[in-house]
């Protein structure tokens, strides 16, 4: 193997005393990404497993691909659909993305290639900036602390990118991922020591620091000078009837043929990747079930209460399921094993808390039509407390048993 031989040849330069000793973390990251780690356990009586942390993170990264590829197509489709109905908007477009799309494809909404290229012209730069800037911080902290670079950043980078609208400026992408990696993870010691989901920390920073680029009706479509509302915004204004009258059926929302963040629109694509996470037991099914229980119970309760002034009270649970970032947050964000509850009972409570909070924010709080991000971050804050009470209750039960 040419690559293996090359890596072995230059390895001594990165070891202790070598010319590039301080960059050993970067060398080790490339080496272990391409090949299995050289260090193995040689003592007896060890449990062997078919997956390690690196393979687990790579699998989570791969599970985002259905949502990623569909998101790129849908981003282009939504833009080309608008161009088809508004030729004057197409003539008024400019910029390097528009020129690149015109050189490689066209602007036909019925063309799979045209839509995919248009969407890729928006998503891939976002992902590239996220990976490069976030990777810089990962390498910097790993070099200073003299430890390996963890593959968890593969997951953080793609999750952060998929939660963003296509029109976000790239410099804001760099700001968001920097805040998420440095403040959300590294200041607490790095991978495994953070108590908040770093991808959501970065998005929350952008949401509050630059709300004009993360909310409203003008950010969800890759078309300059066009404003289009998401399903949740339409529901907040006119209920489910308002969503349907705007041309978005429940099936459209389930498939993801609507405006929204790049990777959060298609519940079907998210379920495909999420099913793999659940089958491989990377994602905790108790958390997913808990989120669903909390969401269904509270949304049904609001349906029974009703309201003459707030149409969101009448929004049924199956619309909450396909609207906004609920599916993506449930399967990819809430199930983060580091920032979620660790006890089995705690996972149920953690999930139910998130399900209740997301409906509460969506229905009652008029300032935030989408509540999944805030609900999960609130759940992250409560996770240690939940586990504490679960452990203490178990200790008391054991002590009472021995009395």
Swiss-Prot record:
| Alphabetical list of Pfam families matching this protein | NQR2_RnfD_RnfE
Q: DNA repair: is it a keyword of this entry?
A: no
Residues annotated as carrying FMN phosphoryl threonine in the record are 230
Q: Which cofactors does this gene product need?
A: FMN
Catalyzed reaction equations: a ubiquinone + n Na(+)(in) + NADH + H(+) = a ubiquinol + n Na(+)(out) + NAD(+)
Q: What is its main location?
A: membrane
What are the TM regions of this chain, as residue ranges? 56-76, 121-141, 164-184, 195-212, 237-257, 265-285, 287-307, 312-332, 348-368, 371-391
- Which controlled-vocabulary keywords does the entry list? Cell inner membrane, Cell membrane, Flavoprotein, FMN, Ion transport, Membrane, NAD, Phosphoprotein, Sodium, Sodium transport, Translocase, Transmembrane, Transmembrane helix, Transport, Ubiquinone
Question: Per its UniProt entry, what is the enzyme's top EC class, as one word?
Answer: translocase
Q: Name one GO molecular function term.
A: oxidoreductase activity, acting on NAD(P)H, quinone or similar compound as acceptor
Q: Which cysteines are joined by disulfide bonds?
A: none
How is the protein disposed in the membrane? Answer: Multi-pass membrane protein
Protein's cellular compartments: Cell inner membrane
GO CC annotations, alphabetized: plasma membrane
**Any idea of its EC number?**
7.2.1.1
Q: What's a single GO BP term from this record?
A: sodium ion transport
Q: How the protein assembles, per its UniProt entry?
A: Composed of six subunits; NqrA, NqrB, NqrC, NqrD, NqrE and NqrF.
**What NCBIfam families is this protein classified in?**
nqrB, PRK05349.1
Q: Which protein family is it in?
A: Belongs to the NqrB/RnfD family.
Reported function: NQR complex catalyzes the reduction of ubiquinone-1 to ubiquinol by two successive reactions, coupled with the transport of Na(+) ions from the cytoplasm to the periplasm. NqrA to NqrE are probably involved in the second step, the conversion of ubisemiquinone to ubiquinol.
- The name under which this protein is listed is Na(+)-translocating NADH-quinone reductase subunit B
Q: Which gene encodes it?
A: nqrB
């Amino acid at each position: 193997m040419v690559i293996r031989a090359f890596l072995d040849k230059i390895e001594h330069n990165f070891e202790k005393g070598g010319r590039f000793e301080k960059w050993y973390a970067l060398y080790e990251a490339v080496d272990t990404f391409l090949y299995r780690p050289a260090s193995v356990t040689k003592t007896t009586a060890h449990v062997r497993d078919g997956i390690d942390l690196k393979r687990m993170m790579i699998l989570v990264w791969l599970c985002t691909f259905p949502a990623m590829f569909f998101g790129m197509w849908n981003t282009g489709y939504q833009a080309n659909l608008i161009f088809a109905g508004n030729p004057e908007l197409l003539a008024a477009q400019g910029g390097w993305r528009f020129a690149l799309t015109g050189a490689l494809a066209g602007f036909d909404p019925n063309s799979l290639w045209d839509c995919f290229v248009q969407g890729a012209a928006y998503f891939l730069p976002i992902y590239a900036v996220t990976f490069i800037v976030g990777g810089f911080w990962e390498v910097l902290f790993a070099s200073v602390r003299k430890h390996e670079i963890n593959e968890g950043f593969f997951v953080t980078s793609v999750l952060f990118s998929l939660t963003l609208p296509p029109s976000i400026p790239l410099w804001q992408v760099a700001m968001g991922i920097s805040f998420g990696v440095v403040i959300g993870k590294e200041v607490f010691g790095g991978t495994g020591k953070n108590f908040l989901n770093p991808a959501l920390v970065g998005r929350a920073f952008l949401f509050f620091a630059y709300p004009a680029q993360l909310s409203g009706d003008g950010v969800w479509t890759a078309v300059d000078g066009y404003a289009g509302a998401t399903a949740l915004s339409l529901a907040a204004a006119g209920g489910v009837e308002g969503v349907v009258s705007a041309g978005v059926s429940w099936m459209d929302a389930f498939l993801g043929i609507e405006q929204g963040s790049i990777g959060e629109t298609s519940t079907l694509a998210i379920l495909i990747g999420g099913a793999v996470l659940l089958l491989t037991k990377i994602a905790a099914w108790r958390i997913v079930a808990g989120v669903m229980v909390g969401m269904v119970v509270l949304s049904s309760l609001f349906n029974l209460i009703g309201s003459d002034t707030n149409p969101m009270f009448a929004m049924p649970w199956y619309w909450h399921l396909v609207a906004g970032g609920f599916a993506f947050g449930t399967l990819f964000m809430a199930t983060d094993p580091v920032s979620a509850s660790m006890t089995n009972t705690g996972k149920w409570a953690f999930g139910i808390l998130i399900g209740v909070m997301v409906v509460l924010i969506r229905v009652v709080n008029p300032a935030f039509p989408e509540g999944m991000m805030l609900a999960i971050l609130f759940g992250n804050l409560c996770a240690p407390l939940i586990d504490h009470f679960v452990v203490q209750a178990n200790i008391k039960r054991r002590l009472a048993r021995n009395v």
